């Protein structure tokens, strides 16, 4: 059973498999905001769950993530009225060239996008 006070669920990387499980098996989660951080969007199962059970999700992914596919991402965004934060040159761990300062700047960008998403209707 999912706590009724939960409004947002987040999955990161392999956690997006758990997120898809929640959405498939617990109908009450389908009204919650979902944040898919470095989702495994090359997985057809993940794509299917996002399309059928995730309303207006936020997807966060880097262009150097091996799971990044611009066509798949665009299809998901169109199918769900979702939003995305795509980080140029970021890998699956959100690491970017430029050392620690660049990484901190990426984390700030992501937190700002997540905050805006959480505050949105």
Predicted regions, residues:
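Primarily recognizes the serine-hydrolase "nucleophile elbow" in alpha/beta-hydrolase
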Residues: 1-55
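Conserved beta-strand scaffold positions in the cores of enzyme catalytic domains, especially
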Residues: 34, 84-86
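Cofactor-binding loop segments of dinucleotide-utilizing enzymes, especially the Rossmann-like FAD-
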Residues: 39, 62-63, 89
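Short beta-strand/loop motif that positions the catalytic acidic residue
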Residues: 53-54, 59-61, 65
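Acidic catalytic loop of the alpha/beta-hydrolase fold
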Residues: 63-68, 92-93
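Conserved loop-alpha-helix segment in the C-terminal half of the alpha/beta-hydrolase fold
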Residues: 69-82
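Catalytic histidine-centered segment of alpha/beta-hydrolase-like enzymes
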Residues: 90-106
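C-terminal alpha-helix
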Residues: 109, 113-121
């Amino acid at each position: 059973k999912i706590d009724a006070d939960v409004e947002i669920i987040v999955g990161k990387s392999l956690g997006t498999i758990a997120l898809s499980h929640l959405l498939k098996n617990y109908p009450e989660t389908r009204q919650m905001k979902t944040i898919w951080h470095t989702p495994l969007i090359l997985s057809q199962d993940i794509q299917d769950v996002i399309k059928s059970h995730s309303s207006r999700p936020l997807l966060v992914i880097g262009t150097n993530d091996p799971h990044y596919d611009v066509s798949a991402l665009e299809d998901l965004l169109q199918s769900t009225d979702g939003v995305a934060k795509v980080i140029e040159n970021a890998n699956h761990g959100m690491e970017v060239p430029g050392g620690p300062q660049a990484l901190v700047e990426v984390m700030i960008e992501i937190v700002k996008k997540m905050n805006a998403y959480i505050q949105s209707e």
